[in-house]
């Protein structure tokens, strides 16, 4: 067997039965910022009603950086926590026209008075994130407070691009967001969510959640006013836009949403009337959601390469800020039906890989941290027996289930820490994807193996720590020196190599 060694801490090859991993720590790409998830919507119920032991278990799975006695991580160590700032639909009850109470959200503002005891269940997990050392928090709105909207509700009119907002209330809106951001000391604030969808009532006359569309002109105007308010009040929170509903709306200028597309150029080009790049309190970031663009592989890769190229030209970072399995994804995987196993985990890992490797995402977030739904939308699930759904049976207490998707995301989030740089890395093993990262103290590699099992010989002069998520493993730790690294079939593996 031909031996490969470190060459000035630049290049290493690990032989794998004729295959090899090669990487170069001097060829770097983006600097990683964070991995996150959101508290919608179940945390409102869980944090308020569930037994303390179960709330602590959820917090440990999501936030912990500790290991058990065998060296296996207790949690996935998220570095970003997304907190939904409610619009007041919960207080409206059925009059909100939002069908399910789980999807309604309280508001901190009643009249001119703030009640910081509202959204108490969500606050439990926001506090837990901070106590566990999560470095970044982000508050996001799906709708403006109902007292500031055109229709007095937290849902849209049903017309595309029609912002459900009374523009005479813009000062009250900036005051509200500034006060909430300052009170909770959010690192970031996202004022709009998936502006391309209509968020109106369905045929039943009711909607499924809070939300409003908005066109690029109005989004830029409102964001500029908010940015100025943050600057005037010395608010430390940074503004993040635009949470596009699909990634094509970031780059495409001839889409089916003509007043809501081409958002990278529109918001960050010096020649655009909607340019926000010069606002000191607006983060040089464009946020988008990976829904409906992940299958087939050719579309997943090509679109992300376009996003990465456009973001680089605009000199901004790209954040993938929300994803779960929706739709039928070209027949590859359907959103309906819970899957706690590796099929969904591997699909999600391929999406994470594409966003980071092809689009140069610096941040990647999942949608629902905890779900009660019979749907592929959670990292953790809460059910009472076979009773699935956002209902009274699961409202006050239920059994908890960790998914392989949780742990596969942890193969990234637990080890690819804020400030690490992505480096050049490749593997010749068929059906295996790889990304590499370094902080000069250690080098981290995440392998997404959708094919057969294989072995790699580790170099004798380095201890390699492996963490594997597979059918019978969840971030399971093994230390290897001068031995063979077993990469299981259908697995996600993280390799950590300490630099000398």
Please place each PLM-identified region on the residue numbering.
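Glycine-rich tight-turn/loop motif centered on a GG-T
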Residues: 163, 205-215
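Bacterial Sec-dependent N-terminal signal peptides
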Residues: 1-19
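Short glycine-rich, flexible loops that bind phosphorylated cofactors or substrates
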Residues: 90, 295, 373
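Catalytic metal-binding/acid-base residues of hydrolase active sites
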Residues: 195-196, 245, 287, 291-292, ...
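Aromatic/acidic polysaccharide-binding cleft in carbohydrate-active enzymes
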Residues: 317-410, 424-427
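Short acidic, glycine/proline-rich loop/turn micro-motifs
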Residues: 150-153, 201-205, 331-333
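Glycoside hydrolase catalytic-domain groove-lining segments
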Residues: 115-117, 124, 235-239, 276-331
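Non-catalytic accessory regions flanking glycosidase/transglycosidase catalytic cores in CAZymes
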Residues: 18-191, 197, 217-255, 259-272, ...
């Amino acid at each position: 067997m031909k031996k490969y060694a470190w060459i000035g801490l630049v290049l290493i090859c690990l032989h794998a039965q004729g295959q090899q991993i090669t990487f170069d720590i001097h060829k770097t790409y983006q600097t990683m910022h964070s991995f996150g998830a959101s508290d919608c919507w179940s945390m409102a119920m869980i944090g308020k009603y569930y037994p303390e032991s179960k709330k602590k278990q959820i917090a440990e799975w999501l936030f912990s950086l500790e290991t058990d006695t065998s060296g296996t991580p207790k949690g996935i160590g998220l570095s970003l926590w997304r907190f939904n700032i409610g619009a007041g639909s919960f207080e409206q009850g059925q009059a909100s026209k939002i069908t399910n109470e789980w999807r309604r959200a309280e508001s901190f503002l009643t009249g001119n008075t703030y009640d910081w005891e509202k959204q108490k269940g969500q606050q439990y997990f926001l506090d837990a994130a901070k106590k566990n050392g999560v470095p970044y928090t982000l508050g996001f709105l799906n709708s403006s407070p109902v007292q500031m909207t055109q229709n007095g509700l937290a849902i849209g009119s049903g017309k595309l691009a029609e912002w459900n907002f009374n523009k005479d209330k813009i000062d009250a809106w900036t005051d509200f967001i500034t006060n909430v951001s300052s009170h909770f000391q959010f690192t970031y604030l996202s004022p709009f969510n998936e502006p391309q969808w209509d968020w109106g009532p369905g045929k039943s006359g009711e909607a499924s959640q809070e939300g409003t569309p908005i066109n690029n002109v109005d989004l830029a105007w409102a964001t500029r006013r908010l940015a100025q308010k943050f600057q005037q009040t010395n608010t430390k929170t940074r503004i993040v836009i635009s949470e596009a509903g699909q990634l094509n709306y970031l780059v495409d200028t001839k889409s089916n949403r003509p007043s809501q597309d081409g958002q990278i150029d529109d918001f960050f080009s010096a020649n655009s009337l909607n340019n926000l790049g010069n606002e000191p309190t607006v983060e040089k970031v464009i946020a988008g959601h990976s829904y409906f663009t992940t299958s087939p592989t050719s579309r997943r890769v090509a679109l992300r390469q376009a996003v990465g190229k456009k973001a680089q030209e605009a000199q901004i970072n790209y954040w993938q800020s929300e994803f779960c399995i929706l739709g039928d994804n070209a027949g590859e995987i359907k959103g309906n039906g819970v899957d706690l196993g590796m099929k969904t985990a591997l699909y999600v890992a391929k999406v994470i890989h594409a966003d980071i490797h092809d689009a140069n995402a610096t941040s990647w977030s999942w949608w629902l941290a905890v779900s009660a739904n019979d749907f592929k939308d959670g990292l953790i699930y809460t059910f009472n027996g076979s009773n699935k759904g956002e209902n009274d049976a699961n409202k006050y207490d239920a059994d908890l289930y960790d998914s392989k998707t949780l742990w596969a995301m942890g193969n990234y989030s637990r080890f690819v820490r804020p400030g690490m740089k992505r480096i050049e890395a490749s593997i010749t093993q068929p059906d295996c994807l790889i990304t590499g990262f370094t902080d000069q103290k250690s080098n981290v590699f995440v392998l997404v193996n959708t094919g057969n099992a294989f072995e790699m010989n580790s170099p004798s002069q380095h201890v390699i720590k492996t963490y594997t998520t597979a059918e019978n493993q969840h971030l399971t730790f093994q230390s290897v020196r001068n031995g063979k690294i077993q990469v299981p079939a259908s697995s996600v593996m993280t390799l950590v190599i300490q630099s000398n």
